[in-house]
């Protein structure tokens, strides 16, 4: 009969509990709907699902409707009116209000009138007002692009964090398996009388630390996954798996001038400022159109009764119609508009300064981002070399420990150094991608 001593029983229980802990998260995730997604797929989903993007798409749609409303000014205006009245008797008196006489009048009165007018000249006010609204719509489109960038960048951060945590989970799982193997080997060495129980305890403590770190990683993965699922309006049970080819892809290394040129042409803030200047130019022309008269073609018809300009009043209807040209000019614009133009020119100067400031800011931001991007490659090379050295160091220390040439503390230190190097390498690789985006 094989008798299990107390220490062996304790180790068996620990191993069983560990296996259960490792299996449980996997079984929980298995109940979820796993979905491998690339960054471009996230962006496409965000375009249709993101609440933030939908808000600014509504703003663009509203700007389109503003243009449609403004174009109504090109259409003719048609007005119709109708009224029914009760008319009293007419009173006629001398100019000094003496000798007044009352004349009976028909008491029912009616009035039907219709008038149509078409503006044929307004000094360009309608045309330039529509042009200003079209520019306003383009500004709203760049605002939409800016907020899309914000959403994309937020998604990229969550996605790369999720990728990093999953890679780190693989690193920790591998190190935990190696730690379990070391513990098994130490138990064998203890049974042979060449290792102390204290040596095993050190590695068991390290294993427990790794287990806790793994639990933290699983929690971080769930948090990032929930954020992505919520932003993209996906089912709550969706488990997003990052595209594993991302790390193997070669990141481009264009010169800074290329990035500067792209930013100069495509930066939402720069394009918004340029369009703001263009819109102010159109508004200036709208204001100047106020110095010009407005000319319209008009036509109308009027049917009314009774005929009150005859005495006695005639109980008849009379119909009149007319066609002509109307001229309207606001004389007050002569002394009011110069102040409006002065205020507008101040706004133009301010917009020029804002554009220059924005160009400078974008240029500095691109330079800083490009510098960090290049630095991330250098960091990756450094961490890659550190990982190589840490692995070589661990292999040497493990071999020496197997031959009783070093203490277990040296082996633990070497193992910790290797784990740290592996973690830093994964972080450095993800950092390159993050700085690129």
Predicted regions and their residues:
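Amphipathic alpha-helical coiled-coil segments
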Residues: 55-70, 147, 151-170, 224, ...
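Small/polar, glycine/serine/threonine/aspartate-rich low-complexity segments that form flexible
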Residues: 31-35, 81-118, 243-253, 285, ...
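Acidic, low-complexity, intrinsically disordered peripheral segments
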Residues: 1, 31-32, 424-437
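Bacterial Sec-pathway N-terminal export signals of envelope proteins
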Residues: 20, 28-83, 236-278, 330, ...
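A glycine-/polar-enriched beta->alpha junction
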Residues: 44-54, 61-76, 106, 113-132, ...
